[in-house]
Regions:
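A short acidic, amphipathic alpha-helical/loop segment
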Residues: 50-51, 259-262, 289
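Catalytic histidine-centered segment of alpha/beta-hydrolase-like enzymes
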Residues: 278-287, 291
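Conserved HGGG/HGGXW glycine-rich cap/lid loop of the alpha/beta-hydrolase fold
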Residues: 26-74
């Protein structure tokens, strides 16, 4: 399906990856370097509608609905949402579009992007992360930082049985409140709000999204329980060897600066840039500023 928007050719298509359906949005010309865009919770490939057109003169933007989201396939079992399955999806998508790419991940998409960069480094030419976390610094923050522990308590609520039912009630009132807590959500209104509601669909759609939290082995201490020791993680196996850009909206209330502390020891080619007056949703709030930094870096 082809459409014109602001002089830009945009395409959407359905592909098969490992025998499963994936929905892709693309912007720009396939002859350009590929930029794979991985959304987080609770978004979908339409999350890039503001940013991708600003990049597409120089890169070919490819954005999938990830497993369990939007129009892509939605497994019902929890095992299917473990990180190695999510990475396998992205490997298949990259093989479909050419084999390697610049990879950009936000939120949960950042977790997949980091895992891909560690397990399949030749497929990631450059790595861009926006308000997302490498597993080692984040797990350390969840053991050592009272502020990050407090900020991450919502994960326990999401992991509860039946949380998806509460999230869909009253036209997704709780879901919208959860990802707007303490942050600027003026961008989520009108047609965009309608698009998000459509992407979430129903209770089964929201359950699939929440299953990403249920399937992860991330240790999040509870506020009323003793903190267990830092789980063993082998730093030598978690290095990010390719050029790495970390973009950050400093007013994020879910992921605090402690969540990326020490990242430079794992990423020798790290560059950090903070976007003023933005929070977790920087790609919606200041897409022009984000695009300028990305284009100057790549």
């Amino acid at each position: 399906m082809w459409s014109e928007k602001g002089g830009l050719v945009k395409m959407s298509e359905i592909i098969q990856v490992n025998g499963q359906r994936f929905f892709l949005r693309t912007w720009g010309e396939p002859k350009n370097p590929v930029l794979l865009l991985l959304h987080g919770f609770p978004e979908f490939s339409g999350a890039w509608e503001e940013l991708a057109p600003l990049l597409s003169d120089q890169v070919y933007c490819v954005a999938p609905d990830q497993r369990g989201y939007g129009q892509s396939f939605r497994p019902s079992d929890l095992e299917s949402y473990k990180i190695h399955h999510l990475v396998s999806d992205v490997v298949g998508i990259l093989e479909h579009i050419g084999g390697s790419a610049i990879v950009l991940g936000h939120d949960w998409g950042a977790s997949v992007a980091y895992a891909l960069a560690m397990s399949h480094p030749t497929m990631v030419e450059k790595l861009i992360i926006m308000n997302g976390v490498h597993p080692l610094p984040f797990q350390r923050a969840l053991v050592e930082s009272p502020e990050q522990i407090a900020a991450s308590q919502y994960i326990h609520w999401l992991r509860r049985a039946g949380s998806e039912q509460v999230l869909v009630e009253n036209d997704f009132e709780r879901l919208r409140a959860m990802f707007s807590h303490g942050m600027n959500m003026q961008w989520l209104s009108g047609e965009k709000w309608d698009a998000y509601r459509s992407a979430w669909g129903d209770v089964e759609g929201v359950k699939a999204m929440v299953n990403w939290y249920r399937a992860t082995g991330l240790y999040v201490p509870k506020l009323d329980e003793p903190i267990e020791p830092m789980p063993h993680m082998e730093a030598g196996e978690m290095m990010i060897q390719m050029p790495h850009l970390l973009l950050w909206g400093a007013a994020d209330t879910a992921l605090l600066p402690q969540s990326y502390a020490g990242l430079e020891a794992l990423a020798p080619q790290l560059k950090f840039a903070s976007i003023p007056d933005t929070d977790h949703w920087l790609h919606h709030q200041k897409p022009e500023a984000v695009a300028d930094i990305i284009l100057n870096w790549i």
